A protein has these predicted regions:
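Mobile genetic element proteins and their domesticated derivatives, centered on retroelements
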Residues: 4-5, 31, 58-60, 69, ...
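A short, polar/acidic, helix/strand-boundary loop motif
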Residues: 71-95, 99, 103, 120-137
């Protein structure tokens, strides 16, 4: 909404026309997608903020290898395709956060959730829901849309990487190490549908 509001700055009459930028059009597509499926009903959110530690929700990414996400006893991981050779690790860290909501967001419905990530710049992007980086904005839109669909309010907080050992082992594709550290988790990972795999998302 911020970009839409910014467009009205300096406009003196309601009949004046405004040129919509490509970014603004992409923002409008998010709202159109949500409103097309919204049934007009919503539930009051619980006042409690559910942290990553309370939900057992952790994600991580390794720039050279892959990504991992954990939610309760559920988990998933994957290897980066060659096309995801980004220098900005924040983009790689953002993907498993958004992925976790697409996979398990229905279980987090109607809650206020505090995401933990070990990337401080990503914390800033998530909390402001804005960035000058077009690739990060791509994931901001994905995050906003899925949270609208599940009536989730979210914010992020920095967590030191050393406290994120389980997701870190998955992002390094060390599955056996993960299973030794987390015996209580499901034996098999959650399958990531093709349309949610990184090669299907090109920010």
């Amino acid at each position: 909404m911020g970009r839409l509001i910014d467009l009205t700055v300096g406009i003196q009459s309601p009949h004046h026309l405004i040129r919509l930028s490509k970014d603004v059009k992409e923002d409008l597509k998010v709202w159109l997608s949500f409103l097309s499926n919204f049934n007009g009903r919503s539930f009051f959110l619980e006042e409690t903020w559910y942290s990553s530690s309370k939900l057992d929700l952790y994600t991580d990414a390794s720039g050279a290898l892959g990504f991992g996400a954990i939610f309760g006893s559920r988990w998933c991981y994957g290897k980066w395709p060659a096309t995801w050779s980004y220098s900005n690790i924040a983009i790689l860290e953002f993907y498993p956060i958004v992925l976790s909501l697409y996979l398990w967001g229905h279980v987090m419905r109607n809650r206020c959730i505090l995401f933990f990530t070990d990337n401080e710049s990503l914390v800033h992007v998530i909390n402001k829901q804005s960035s000058k980086d077009k690739s990060l904005i791509f994931f901001v839109r994905k995050l906003v849309l899925i949270c609208l669909e599940y009536n989730i309010v979210f914010k992020a907080k920095h967590i030191a990487g050393v406290k994120n050992r389980l997701a870190d082992s998955l992002s390094r594709l060390q599955v056996q190490s993960f299973k030794q550290l987390a015996a209580a988790h499901m034996e098999l990972p959650t399958e990531i549908p093709l349309h949610l795999q990184p090669q299907s998302w090109q920010p």
